């Protein structure tokens, strides 16, 4: 049933679908017509199905409309349906479980005093290497207790000058200290960046030898990785990032193509805030075996690598089924008939899979993909296609949150409204099983605020009003939609989120406010030109220029990017500060979703134009397996 004609205006029936299944049930809608005042007597408006590269079209109803000419969905149903995998056999899971046990034994051996893996001259670095390896290989969820034990041991030997390679090394080591600073900080330990001061010369500069050995390059590579986990005001981290970036770029000009050069290029390009875990795992699997600077037994490396490949491919078999389910959902609601809008459900799902690779988190991955897709459709309706009269009707319908409200909507809006209504209610039911309380009212409030911000922007477009920067940002933090894409899928994860915890993660916490501000500003630096061409004048860039007469567009973009950099350091602190009373793992979900959108806006507006980078991400992380 096509979305544009899914529910005729005089129909008393509504096609209901479930979020995680596709059983259809026809239910009668209340016969009472909603008292919305603006409801037009029986007039329905269906959009023209012809695409245009212009920004203004006239439909068969004679209503002038703007469309953006977005390209079509790149992932056809046949491609999704034909995805195959050979890793569903129980034998692969059995082998992976055996390897998990063997790796646990390796962790256990590290706790044996003066054992084969615990030389007092290298035990600290060995523990850090193991933790870092299982995390980057995407298998750390199996070793949470072992990781905590290893890091507790390292932290017990941490000093104001850092650490050496082992507890009896006698001298601090840049590689171990940098890796320790990064890893301990990310796990919530209190460690000061001032340990890096002890690796500067008398002039206060980081130094290196003229000959760039592989070992020294890896030292600086870990310094670079550590420098990205910076808090506000940490000048030493800024200096470390500048030095290590210059050093590594220079090294790339001198060393031959190798796993090391591939790793350097990857980390310089994606850093931390645009680095998605499964994307890094795919890269690290390719280069893991080439690092021989640390004398870890070959057998350990082989076990870790085999386990990482198996887990990557076993997860791929689950991804295949979830993608096929998502594709059916997309067709089932008639979304393909909405040709004036973007269709990026496959890309959104991929981004979710890149930050949530636990098989138990299927509801999160599918929920994020579906909500993000529906928000994108609504964005195109409010920003371009809908008339102001229609948008007021849709806004009132969302505020009412009643399926009978569709009787007052144009045909092309009916299916969109019911898709949101059905799926949010279904997701709330899934969340209630975990949270123990009804999350529908919580979700409704967030959607009301979101739609309210959308209609405000539509009014600005309609009237030609250009707000001040502060006025724009306050509204834009809500209209970006990150709160919705974060909160509702997160409630389906397997841990409880009582009100006290939610207040530290969701609105109006500083943590949530920073994420919303960062994403609005970052998105605008990549979208403002295309938005302006469609008649959407208000953006962070244009509003900043209004507040600062005479400033050039380039300088305004630079100023907004500088704001993003500063806010990102504040976000690092809010994520990792030890006194928040909220486990980092809870906040990490929202933080990782922030990274998802950071990645999407890294090169351009990757959510309007499915760039080669996004296509490659889908291919390498959810379409292809890795050879064993």
UniProtKB/Swiss-Prot annotation:
UniProt-annotated location(s): Plastid, Chloroplast
Keyword Chloroplast found: yes
Coiled coil (residue ranges): none
InterPro entries: Isoprenoid_synthase_dom_sf, Terpene_cyclase-like_1_C, Terpene_cyclase_plant_C1, Terpene_synth_N, Terpene_synth_N_sf, Terpene_synthase-like, Terpene_synthase_metal-bd, Terpenoid_cyclase/PrenylTrfase
Span of chain positions assigned to the transit peptide in the UniProt entry: 1-48
This enzyme's EC code(s): 4.2.3.121
Reaction(s) catalysed by this chain's protein: (2E)-geranyl diphosphate = (1R,5R)-alpha-pinene + diphosphate
Binding site residues for K(+): 539
CDD domains xrefs: Terpene_cyclase_plant_C1
UniProt xrefs under Pfam families: Terpene_synth, Terpene_synth_C
GO biological process, any: geranyl diphosphate metabolic process
Motif (DDXXD motif): 379-383
Cellular component GO terms held in the UniProt record: chloroplast
Single GO MF annotation: potassium ion binding
Record-listed Mg(2+) 2 binding positions: 379, 383
Positions of Mg(2+) 1 binding: 379, 383
Keyword Chloroplast belongs to the record: yes
Activity across pH: Optimum pH is 7.5.
Function: Involved in defensive oleoresin formation in conifers in response to insect attack or other injury. Involved in monoterpene (C10) olefins biosynthesis. Produces mainly (+)-alpha-pinene (97%) with a small amount of (-)-alpha-pinene (3%).
Family assignment from sequence similarity: Belongs to the terpene synthase family. Tpsd subfamily.
Swiss-Prot/TrEMBL domain comment: The Asp-Asp-Xaa-Xaa-Asp/Glu (DDXXD/E) motif is important for the catalytic activity, presumably through binding to Mg(2+).
Protein name per its UniProtKB record: (+)-alpha-pinene synthase, chloroplastic
Source organism of the structure: Pinus taeda (Loblolly pine)
Organism taxonomic ancestry: Eukaryota, Viridiplantae, Streptophyta, Embryophyta, Tracheophyta
Gene designation: PT30
């Amino acid at each position: 049933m096509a979305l544009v004609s899914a529910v005729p205006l005089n129909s008393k029936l509504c096609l209901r679908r479930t979020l995680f299944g596709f059983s259809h049930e026809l239910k009668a809608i209340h016969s009472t017509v909603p008292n919305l005042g603006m409801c037009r007597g029986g007039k329905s408006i269906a959009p023209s199905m012809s695409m245009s590269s212009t920004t203004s079209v006239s439909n068969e109803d004679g209503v002038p409309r703007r469309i953006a000419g977005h390209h079509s969905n790149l992932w056809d149903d046949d491609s999704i349906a034909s995805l195959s995998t050979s890793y569903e056999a129980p034998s692969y899971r059995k082998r992976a479980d055996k390897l998990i046990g063997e790796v646990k034994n390796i962790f256990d051996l590290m706790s044996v005093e003066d054992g084969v893996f615990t030389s007092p001259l290298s035990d600290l670095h060995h523990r850090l290497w193991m933790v870092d390896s299982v995390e980057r290989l995407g298998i750390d969820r199996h070793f949470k207790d072992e990781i905590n034990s290893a890091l507790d041991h390292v932290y017990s030997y941490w000093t104001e000058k850092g650490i050496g390679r082992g507890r009896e090394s006698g001298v601090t080591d840049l590689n171990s200290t940098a890796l320790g600073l990064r890893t301990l900080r990310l796990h919530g330990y209190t460690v000061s960046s001032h340990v890096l001061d002890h690796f500067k010369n008398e002039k206060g500069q980081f130094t290196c030898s003229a000959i760039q050995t592989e070992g020294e390059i890896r030292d600086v590579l870990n310094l670079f990785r550590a420098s990205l986990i910076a808090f506000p005001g940490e000048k030493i981290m800024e200096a470390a990032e500048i030095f290590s970036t210059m050093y590594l770029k220079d090294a790339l000009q001198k060393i031959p193509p190798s796993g090391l050069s591939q790793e350097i290029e990857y980390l310089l390009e994606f850093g931390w805030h645009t680095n998605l875990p499964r994307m890094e795992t795919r890269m690290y699997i390719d280069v893991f075996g080439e690092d021989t600077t640390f004398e870890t037994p070959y057998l350990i490396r082989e076990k870790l690598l085999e386990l990482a490949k198996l887990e990557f491919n076993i997860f791929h078999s689950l991804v295949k089924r979830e993608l096929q389910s998502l594709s059916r959902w997309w067709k089932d609601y008639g979304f393909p008939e909405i040709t004036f809008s973007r269709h990026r459900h496959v890309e959104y799902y991929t981004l979710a899979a890149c930050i949530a690779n636990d098989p138990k988190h299927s509801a999160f991955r599918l929920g994020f993909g579906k909500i993000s897709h529906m928000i994108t459709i609504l964005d195109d309706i409010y920003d371009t296609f809908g008339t102001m009269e229609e948008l007021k009707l849709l806004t009132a319908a969302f505020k009412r949150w009643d399926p009978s409200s569709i009787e007052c909507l144009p045909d092309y809006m009916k299916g969109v409204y019911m898709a949101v209504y059905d799926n949010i209610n279904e997701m709330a039911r899934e969340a209630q099983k975990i949270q123990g309380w009804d999350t529908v009212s919580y979700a409704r409030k967030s959607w009301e605020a979101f739609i309210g911000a959308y209609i405000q922007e539509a009014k600005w477009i309609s009237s030609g009003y250009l707000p001040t920067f502060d006025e724009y940002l306050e509204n834009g933090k809500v209209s970006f939609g990150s709160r919705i894409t974060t909160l509702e899928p997160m409630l389906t994860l397997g841990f409880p989120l009582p009100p006290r915890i939610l207040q530290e993660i969701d609105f109006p916490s500083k943590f949530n406010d920073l994420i919303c501000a960062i994403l609005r500003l970052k998105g605008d630096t990549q979208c403002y030109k295309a938005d302006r061409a469609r008649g959407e004048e208000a953006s962070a860039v244009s509003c900043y220029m209004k507040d600062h007469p005479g400033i050039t567009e380039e300088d305004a973009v630079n100023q907004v990017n500088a704001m993003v950099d500063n806010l990102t350091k504040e976000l690092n602190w809010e994520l990792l500060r030890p006194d928040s009373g909220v486990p980092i793992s809870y906040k990490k979900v929202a933080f990782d979703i922030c990274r998802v959108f950071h990645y999407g806006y890294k090169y351009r507006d990757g959510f309007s134009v499915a760039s080669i980078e996004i296509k490659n991400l889908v291919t390498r992380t959810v379409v292809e397996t890795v050879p064993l």
